[in-house]
Structures are given as structure tokens and as C-alpha cells.
Amino acid sequence: MRVNDLTPQDLKAYGINDVQELVYNPDYDTLYQEELNPALEGYERGVLTNTGAIAVDTGIFTGRSPKDKYIVRDDTTRDTLWWADKGKGKNDNKPLSQETWQHLKGLVTQQLSGKRLFIIDAFCGANADTRLSVRFITEVAWQAHFVKNMFIRPTDEELQDFEPDFIVMNGAKCTNPQWKEQGLNSENFIAFNLTERIQLIGGTWYGGEMKKGMFSVMNYLLPLQGIASMHCSANVGEEGDVAVFFGLSGTGKTTLSTDPKRRLIGDDEHGWDDDGVFNFEGGCYAKTIRLSAEAEPDIFHAIRRDALLENVTVRADGTVDFDDASKTENTRVSYPIYHIDNIVKPVSKAGHASKVIFLTADAFGVLPPVSRLTASQTQYHFLSGFTAKLAGTERGVTEPTPTFSACFGAAFLSLHPTQYAEVLVKRMQAAGAQAYLVNTGWNGTGKRISIKDTRAIIDAIIDGSLDDAETFTLPMFDLAIPTKLPGVDTHILDPRNTYGSPEQWQEKAEALAKLFIENFEKYTDTPAGAALVSAGPR
């Protein structure tokens, strides 16, 4: 199965010794057999479901652990990275000393030494000029399966001379007993060294740490080259018109970009360069809680052989109870992108975007289902990144809580948010793109805006009917709202209509406006940021 001549000897360069066997770039059938091996115990063992997909559990780590993320502070990163301990604004880029890095690296390499290992060589980025060649090393078959699904799978020819730009060593079974003395958050760690170009994982089994780890790396490298790096999904119409959907986990990026009328470019991570929009990934990582064939047919039918389910409840007959959130609200499935029929082929990239959609899940019930943004409002709401953290996507979050996440992805930003905003705005201006704010969250009824209405809103954005619609201005937020749209309940377009009285909306709106204003203060120490204050609520 080995295409190139990778040997256990090669792994000694990473500090991994006495490897029993290398399973190099296994095919899906091999992984299927490995995951169902009855000799496996605990979280290593997969369960076969009636669709042919394998289901695995990730233990207490059913979401990312942002408090356990660290980056080595050295000459490479000292003056470029957006550090957690410098300046204004909250982020997860906690500095790590070289000494502690060496200790953590020793723990992981010791864990992987003397073992039977799975190696996956894959690409991150569909543009051959800027993609990263990544080597993933793990002792767990399903973790190899996960990255095979999620990253771009090289051809046999591309594997012949594959040279990794970045190494990910997943030591999920090891923890750091010296964390207290080292001033770390816990015994678990997700650590990066951008000089050595290595990511280490210890203690957490959550597959998303590998996916989002590489996203953080791309978020460091690309904007420094003038390329937009975006936490968004993207699709393209028959006429070549590209739409991108920004939003945090659970706001609808995957669901809304998976549209039978349009071809999917990707569901979560993209770049935007001189040629257009391109996917970082080769797969999708969709939430499955309360999944149904009726509401989300493409995702539902993508769950078949080679898909990998996480933390779902499998019944005795092999069927999956997608409504069961007893393990987590953040149940997931990863699958190769070709499990979706309507995708861009052969490479997941297209032209420049004409529609930029910011998805927010407003827990206050204040924002309208859709509004058309001015250029300054686009920058303001991109930097604000308002949404609600939805249950389960991070450990310890069980109820929707309002949050501000710069660029709709602060957890993954490696540079200061204004750098991403500047690059995005330049790309949008060059392409003549228009931005919209879409609330997929709640309104005054206390219920979530229906996916039917949201899909009709997206259709109106894509086909241009929203741009042609008459609008009125929502007070306090100064947002332009259409008076009516095809297929959308007109009553809900003005959020004030969903309350018992206008005063009830006003009260909540004032509270939310105050949060926006307080959050944006961290950007007002620059002339560019101060100039955007008037684009927000007042």
C-alpha cells in the first residue's frame, strides 16, 4: 500500500523510535477493517451502523478545548502573532516556552514510539501554489480515517514525491502530568511550533483538533501573502456566481451552502486569492443533532460507507438516533466531499465571490432575518462577529449564550482581526461583492427562525431579488431590511413584529446594542477602527 518509500527510520527524524509497523495512507477498506477490529478497546473501537458508516466516541472531549491551545513564542511568531497576553481582544493564542514545547514533544513522541502507526499524507488547500503538504501521525485508525476524510487526498503520482511542510503528531492517549508547574491550563494540550512546523495533540480524542489546527496554520500563513483566509462555506451557481457564508459552528454554514441548485466548493474553510475562492479541505464536518432526510437530504444521504460519525447514539439494530444529545449536542459526521453529489470538480475552487453572507444566531431575538450591509457595516459586522455560542461546540457550553468572535472565527485567528478584515475588503472591492447579515437564530417568539424561511432568504440574496426589494431601516442598528421577499413570511422580516409590543423589542435591542458598542471598543485605538464606530448600533 505504501506508495513512496516512507519507513520507520524516517520517523526517527521526528523523535519517534522503534515503530512496529507503518500503515501508510491506508485506503478506506483497510481503515474499515482496522476500526472494527474486535481486539480494540475504549475510544479506539468503532461501531458499524446500518448505513455502512462507522461511529466512534471521543469521550469527555466532544468539542475543541480552546483553553488548552498554545503556540511557541519565538523569532517567527513574536511580532506577527495575535497573542492572548498582548493588546486588547480575547483570543486563544497562549504563548509557550521553548522548554515546555520540548517537554510536550517528548511526551507525544514517547507515546508514539514502539507502536503500530497510521500515517496520512494529505494537502490543506486546493490551490497548488499555496497548499500545505501535511503529514498526520497517529496510533488510532479512526483518527487517520478522520483526516483522510477532511483533507485533500493526493493522487498516487503526488504521493511519489510528497514532502511534508507540516507535521501533526496526535498523541491522544498521553497527557502532561507537569502542567501545573509549567503554568498550563490542564494535562491536555494542543500545541504549535510554527518554526519547526509541528502540531502536537495530547489528552484529547476530539478529531476536530486536527482539522482546526491546520486552519489556524493557514490563517497565519495566507493573509501575510495578501490572500484572504476565511471561516466560511462557499458554493457556485450555474453562471459561475460564487457565494461565501461566514459563521461560527452551528449557525448554518454547512446546511445553507449545501444547496441542490448550486455546486458546493466547501463547507467550512476557504481562501480567496487572485484566481478566486478555493477550499482548504477535501471533506465536510457536519453537525448531525436532530438531522433528518427531509430538512437536510444531502447531508443525511452523505452518511454512508466511508463516513465517520462522532458521539452519536447507535441503537442495537445499527440505526442512529440523531435526536439523542445525551453524549453532546455537538454530534458530528465527517465524510469526503464527493459524498455530496453537487460539488465543484475536479478541484474545489471557483471564481471570485459576488455575495458575502454573514450568518449569526442571535440569542437575543433582536436582529432581523436579513439585512443588506453598506461597505462600512460589512467591516463592522465582520470584526464584531456576533453570534450565540451553540450548545456543545466547546466544552462547558450547554445553553445558547451571546458572544462576539472576530471575523466569525476568533478561535482560529493567528493574526490580529483587522488584518483579515483588510484583506477581505480588498478582495470584495476588487470583485464588486455585496455583503448581507442573515440571522439564523431566534426572534421574539422564542423560536428559531425556520430553515424554510432562511433558505428562501438565501435564494433571494443569490438571485438578486433582495437587492431589488424595497427596504426600510431598523432603528438603533441602522440596518436596511426588505419589506417583502418571495417565499418568506413577511411578518418576521421586521423583528419588532414578533414581540408582544415594540417596547419589548426596544428593551432587548438596547441591551444588545450596548454589548456591540462595548465589544467594538477594542478596535477604536486605531483611526480605521474608530472610523467604523458609526457603522454599528448606537
UniProtKB/Swiss-Prot annotation:
Q: Which GO terms describe its molecular function?
A: ATP binding; metal ion binding; phosphoenolpyruvate carboxykinase (ATP) activity
Q: Which residues bind Mn(2+)?
A: K212, H231, D268
Keyword Transferase applies: no
Q: What InterPro entries does the annotation carry?
A: PEP_carboxykinase_ATP, PEP_carboxykinase_C, PEP_carboxykinase_N, PEPCK_ATP_CS
Task: Kindly state the subunit structure of this protein.
Answer: Monomer.
Role of this protein: Involved in the gluconeogenesis. Catalyzes the conversion of oxaloacetate (OAA) to phosphoenolpyruvate (PEP) through direct phosphoryl transfer between the nucleoside triphosphate and OAA.
Listed name of the protein: Phosphoenolpyruvate carboxykinase (ATP)
The major lineage groups are: Bacteria, Pseudomonadati, Pseudomonadota, Gammaproteobacteria, Enterobacterales
